[in-house]
Amino acid sequence: TSLLGCGGDKIIVGSETNTNPISNQRPVLNVYIENSGSMDGYMCDGSQLKDAVFDYVSDLSVCSDTTSLNYINNRIIPYKGSLEQYIKTMTPTTFQKAGGNHSNSDLGEMLKMILQEMTDTSVSIFISDCILDLPVSNSQKFLSRCQISIKNAINEGRNKIPDLGVEIIKMTSDFNGKYYYPNGGIEKLKYVKRPYYIWIFGNNNILAKLNSVVPVNELKDFGFEGIVAYSKK
C-alpha cells in the first residue's frame, strides 16, 4: 500500500524487511506521553501501558546517548525525574498538575511540536490514545482538517529530516475511567481493554539499528497488537 506525499513522493506502508543501512549513531531519545483527560483511564493500577512504556524506553535508553522525558498536550512539559519515577507517578492527578490543557488536545499540533524538536540524530517516542477532538456538528469536515494537519506535520518533518521514518505500534491496555464520545457524551468505563498507540520518529538508519537491538515483538507481553512503518522510498 502507498500514500502520496507532497510532490508525488510515495510513503510506503507495509511489512517488508527493513533494508535501510544500520547506523552506529547513538541517538538522543525524546519521550512524550499525552497528558490530556482522555488518557487518565490508562493510569489505573496494573496498567499495561505503564509497563510497556517502562520496558520499551528502558531498552531503547541503553542504545541512546541521552533520554529526555516529557508530557505533551497543547505544549511540551519536560519531566526532570528518572524514568522509574516518571512511570511510578503517572496518575490522573499528576497528569493534571503537570500543566497544559488537560481538557482536550490536537493530535496534529502535538505531532508538529514533536517533529519541530527533532534533529537527524534524535528519535522521538509519542504515546497517545490518538482520539481526535472533533466537534459534535460538522465532524466530517473537521476530521478532514485533522487528517490534513497530521499529513502537513509529517511532511514538514520530512523536509527537515529527509530520511525520516515513522513507526506506529498499536497496543491495548486496561482502562478504568471516563470515555469521551464524539457526540459529547461521557461514559465511565471500568477495567475494559482500550487501544493506544506508540509513535516512533527518527532517521531510517537509526530506527533500523534500534529495531535490531530492541525488536517491537518484545512488547507482546504488554498488549502488542501490530505495527505499521512509513518511510520515503
Please report, for each region that a protein language model flagged, where it lies by residue:
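Sec-dependent bacterial lipoprotein signal peptides
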Residues: 1-4
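Bacterial signal peptide processing site
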Residues: 6-10
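Extracytoplasmic/secreted cell-surface and envelope-processing proteins
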Residues: 11-13, 37-44, 77-81, 132-142, ...
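Von Willebrand factor
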Residues: 22-128, 132-133, 165-168, 172
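Well-ordered, non-membrane alpha-helical segments in soluble/globular domains
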Residues: 45-56, 93-112, 137-157
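A charged, solvent-exposed segment within the mature domains of Sec-exported extracytoplasmic proteins
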Residues: 114-188
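Eukaryote-biased recognition of electropositive, low-complexity segments
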Residues: 162-233
